[in-house]
Amino acid sequence: MIKKILRKIGMDGCVCNLPSGFHASVVLVEKEGWQKVVKIISKDCLRTKKSARLLAEDIVAYYQALKNIGVITPENDIRIIKNGQRYDLVIISPFCGHNVSSRIRSGTEKECLDTISSILAIVKRFFLHPVSSDSSELVCGLDPKPDNFTLDRAGQMHYVDLMPPRYRKDGRAIVEFPPPSSPAGYDLAYFRHFDSRGILLVLRTQLCRIRHDLRPQILELLTDFSRGFNNPCLKDYFDDFPGERFISAGPSERKEIIERLGDEDIYLIRDIATQVACENPLHFDRGWIEDIFHLTHFYDDVPAAENIKEIKKKLSAALKPR
């Protein structure tokens, strides 16, 4: 299907699959000296050309909003293609390097931390534009996972995730596409994409997910970054965050923190898991962390109660002396 779409738009060069996310299939096309990234967004809800056009307009509006706040992101050429009973969006952009997840995962400590610093330089552009001077909520949203940042040959970092287009449309933030069906799902998505506290928490857990062995250094870097903003909301949140207490807590306090975990404590759960793996790398490897992240995955609503129950069992077992 991808090759058929590429032929339809006249891009039938050498095709290489790139890591794809939830919303799009992504390929790199090379032909006659140029390289283009092609993202194909195929959604069942795009049944009419009007719905596809509205989504394309939102992506363009988000791109412009990012440029307005100084975020470096590649230009996009958007095409709408008929595909059976629905319409697909095809987004063509210049190749700006591979995403930095593998660089963080396999690089030296210096390479890893330098890469994170470059990510934070982009995140800073978002944080410098809150909805008001004393708010932790931002004008533009983002998904700060390392998969959404690329490093080009000149060493320039780019933010490349324009789908969903996380900007404020008619006074309401677009957090996902399609939007979560429950208020709890919307609120969680808003917190992780439009609130500086949630964005830093997502970045913290995602980075430590990849490099739990460098967790102390990563936390130090993020703490220094957050202190650069005169925002009491941000400071107070992490001062009171139970994940910080867990680091230095004794066995009984750690047990109490785990027992109190609820279905909205997704990022606290993930944070605790990466701390446990950092302390006990021989017993709790990346596979164990991935199990926890999988059990805490959510979209329309908070994770199921049985998932939280299983997580608490796993974390409680991890606290037992070895």
Q: What are these model-predicted stretches?
A:
Residues 114-142, 146-149:
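Conserved kinase catalytic-core segment
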Residues 135-209:
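Catalytic activation segment of kinase domains across protein kinase-like and atypical kinase folds
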Residues 41-54, 103-110, 172-175:
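Short, flexible/disordered intra-domain loops and linkers
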Residues 12-63:
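ATP-binding glycine-rich loop module of kinase domains
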Residues 1-13:
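Juxta-kinase regulatory segment immediately upstream of eukaryotic protein kinase catalytic domains
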Residues 198-322:
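Helical subdomain adjoining the active site within ATP-dependent kinase catalytic cores
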Residues 64, 70-121:
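Conserved structural core of kinase catalytic domains
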